[in-house]
Amino acid sequence: MTNIRKTHPLMKIVNNAFIDLPAPSNISSWWNFGSLLGICLVLQILTGLFLAMHYTADTATAFSSVTHICRDVNYGWIIRYMHANGASMFFICLFMHVGRGLYYGSYTFLETWNVGVILLFATMATAFMGYCLPWGQMSFWGATVITNLLSAIPYIGTNLVEWIWGGFSVDKATLTRFFAFHFILPFIIAALAMVHLLFLHETGSNSPTGISSDADGIPFRPYYTIKDILGALLLIMGLMLLVLFSPDLLGDPDNYTPANPLNTPPHIKPEWYFLFAYAILRSIPNKLGGVLALVLSILILSLYTLIHTSKQRSMMFRPISQCLFWILVADLLTLTWIGGQPVEHPYIIIGQLASILYFTLILVLMPVASTIGNNLLKW
């Protein structure tokens, strides 16, 4: 008799995606981050659901409702900190996942990669709106500064900003709609993640060598299910260490002060995972130029498929490209550091140089290095 998992319409889908899926036999731990992102998403939706039961999206009570969650709700403090630090873990996994895709040439799976870029944008939008909800000083001023960037768009900018605000400033209407969007977007992200997987399973996974592994596939279960469980345990352990020992390590002390439109914090900055893009935005003196650079810093990922000049897919056997990749990683870390610093000398010039290097590496140096690699191998 045929196994039910192979015949039942619903179980057949699960079977083909997670059990009998042929996977390359040589994929390393860098391939764990996809499943970890799935776990992060489920965790964020669950903790967020319980937070939404006690949160009120109103400027008068939002801050005190978050305080109430932490003080009066049973285990509310752990749910709140798991949600806040879960976002940080989410972005750590996202950056690792994207980095692995760049290093091993996964961007040649065009549809999978572009859905991934859309997922990144959606996750960034969700995180930004979530940061605005506690209605502390940094929530309010972060919302004001970032939404105000849209006013740089010619002709329609000012109208667009007021339309998003629901008035002439960030107020009750803004908070209410941000809560609505913050609630719905994770479900859209979950749907997009399914599309992402659908496209991935059309081609099969990439491997460290970048060579087709059709001739050497192994079943996903038990080999990679066990590997994913190990990754999940390490992720949860890391998250709980953060939540239980230093829950406010990655937050901003200013957000423990209720929002006050009459008092601007001395240094407005977003959460740590947006600092690299924020540094690129600030490094350009022109408002519209800064906004374009900010969007391009992420959108440039979808250009990778067009500027891949190497005859090899992966960077595994391309030492020059490897060097440039790790310089790019160092550059992003530098930008992250600069984004958290005040706008003064020498941080301004460091930020500008790091921003120029970021775009030069991706658009010029990496394609040139790939071409040199081809010539050295007489391809």
UniProtKB/Swiss-Prot annotation:
SUPFAM superfamilies: a domain/subunit of cytochrome bc1 complex (Ubiquinol-cytochrome c reductase) (SSF81648), Transmembrane di-heme cytochromes (SSF81342). Heme b b566 binds at residues 97, 196. The chain crosses the membrane at residues 33-53, 77-98, 113-133, 178-198, 226-246, 288-308, 320-340, 347-367. It is a multi-pass membrane protein. One of its GO terms (molecular function) is metal ion binding. Its cofactor is heme b. It is found in: Mitochondrion inner membrane. One of its GO terms (cellular component) is mitochondrial inner membrane. Binds 2 heme b groups non-covalently. Keywords: Electron transport, Heme, Iron, Membrane, Metal-binding, Mitochondrion, Mitochondrion inner membrane, Respiratory chain, Transmembrane, Transmembrane helix, Transport, Ubiquinone. GO terms for biological process: mitochondrial electron transport, ubiquinol to cytochrome c. Heme b b562 binds at residues 83, 182. A ubiquinone binds at residue 201. The cytochrome bc1 complex contains 11 subunits: 3 respiratory subunits (MT-CYB, CYC1 and UQCRFS1), 2 core proteins (UQCRC1 and UQCRC2) and 6 low-molecular weight proteins (UQCRH/QCR6, UQCRB/QCR7, UQCRQ/QCR8, UQCR10/QCR9, UQCR11/QCR10 and a cleavage product of UQCRFS1). This cytochrome bc1 complex then forms a dimer. PANTHER family: CYTOCHROME B (PTHR19271:SF16). Belongs to the cytochrome b family. Heme 1 (or BL or b562) is low-potential and absorbs at about 562 nm, and heme 2 (or BH or b566) is high-potential and absorbs at about 566 nm. Component of the ubiquinol-cytochrome c reductase complex (complex III or cytochrome b-c1 complex) that is part of the mitochondrial respiratory chain. The b-c1 complex mediates electron transfer from ubiquinol to cytochrome c. Contributes to the generation of a proton gradient across the mitochondrial membrane that is then used for ATP synthesis. This is Cytochrome b. The lineage of its organism: Eukaryota, Metazoa, Chordata, Craniata, Vertebrata.
